[in-house]
Amino acid sequence: MNIPSHGKYGWLPILYEITKDLNPKKIVEFGPGVGFTTVTIASAIKDLGGDVLVNSYDIWMDKYWGRKENSLKFFEEWGVSQYINLEHLDFYDWIKLPTEDRNFDILYFDIDNNSKKLLE
């Protein structure tokens, strides 16, 4: 298992194993930020020998997370770019897509949130 290591994300090995166990055919992720979780999921797909894409969406509004280009570079460094479809898309726009475009086997939802934001 070759995945990123980050103190804030000590559960990445669990995410990797869950992805491998489920062997998903369609993956949706919201809020990749830099890309630690995206790389972890894509690494599991790569190790499965799959041809599945992680459909990862973000809006990159926060200076803390950087730009889309930073995420793409991170994916390249980990050798998993071919397993990731990274797009600028807000969750509220995604939910308006046709149902067939919103199907998934795994949904990883990691947008910038807290209890106050979720209740608003």
Which residues does each PLM region occupy?
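S-adenosylmethionine/decaboxylated-SAM
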Residues: 2, 6-120
